[in-house]
Regions:
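Active-site nucleotide/adenylate-binding loops and adjacent lid/helix of ATP-dependent enzymes
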Residues: 1-8, 12, 145, 152-157
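Active-site "cap" helix and flanking loop/linker of ATP-utilizing ligase/carboxylase catalytic domains
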Residues: 4-26, 32, 41-100
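Conserved protein kinase catalytic/activation segment
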Residues: 34-36
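Generic beta-structure capping elements
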Residues: 40-43, 117-119
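Peripheral (often C-terminal) accessory segments that flank ATP-dependent C-N-forming ligase machineries
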Residues: 66-171
Length: 171
C-alpha cells in the first residue's frame, strides 16, 4: 500500500538525517520510479495545511507540538475518514483579474472549504520562481482516494483569469 511505502521511506530518510523526536515536515512526489523527496525538515507543517491535523485528531497542531516538547500526555481522538489539502498551484504568469468557479468548487462532494488568499491585481508567478500559493482546498471523505479525488475535481472548477504583466522601462 502507498501509505505504508511512504511511511517506510520517510522513517529511513529521517533516521539517516538524525531526526529522533519532534515534528517532521516532509514533501514528496509519487512518481513511476518511486517516492521522490522534495523537502524533509525538522519543523511543523506550515501555514493553513496544519488544519488537517486538527481535523484528524481534534487537537490543534500547536497543542500537540507543545505537549510533546514538555513531555505532557495528550489525548488524540482519531476522526473517521480521511482529510486532504491541496495547495492551489499558480496556473500561469500574469496579473490576477478574478478567480471563477469558487462556488462550483465548494459544491463538490467532500469539499470542506475553498480559500482563495490573493486578490485582484496580485502578480502571479508559477513555480519554481513563484511566490505563495493562491489558496487552499480542503476535503473530508471516507478514504484517502476519495479525499484526493474531491480535491482534484474541485481544482478543475477553478479558473484564474489573468492579464499580461506589462513592464514599463523608464529611461
Amino acid at each position: 500500500n502507498t501509505q505504508n511505502a511512504i511511511y517506510s521511506a520517510l522513517s529511513q530518510v529521517a533516521s539517516a538525517l538524525g531526526f529522533r523526536e519532534g515534528p517532521i515536515h516532509a514533501e514528496l512526489r509519487l512518481a513511476s520510479d518511486g517516492i521522490n523527496f522534495i523537502e524533509l525538515a525538522s519543523r511543523t507543517i506550515g501555514g493553513r495545511c496544519g488544519r488537517v491535523i486538527e481535523f484528524l485528531t481534534g487537537v490543534s497542531l500547536e497543542t500537540i507540538v507543545l505537549a510533546n516538547a514538555v513531555r505532557q500526555p495528550f489525548r488524540l481522538d482519531q476522526q473517521a475518514g480521511a482529510f486532504g489539502v491541496m495547495m492551489i498551484p499558480v496556473p500561469c504568469a500574469g496579473v490576477l483579474r478574478r478567480v471563477e468557479g469558487i462556488t462550483a468548487a465548494r459544491k463538490v462532494p467532500g469539499i470542506v472549504s475553498v480559500d482563495i488568499d490573493i486578490r485582484e491585481g496580485h502578480r502571479l508567478v508559477p513555480w519554481p520562481e513563484g511566490g505563495p500559493y493562491p489558496g487552499f482546498i480542503f476535503s473530508r471523505c471516507k478514504d484517502a482516494d476519495q479525499a484526493e479525488a474531491a480535491l482534484r475535481e474541485a481544482h478543475t472548477k477553478l479558473s484564474f483569469v489573468t492579464a499580461p504583466e506589462l513592464r514599463v522601462k523608464v529611461a
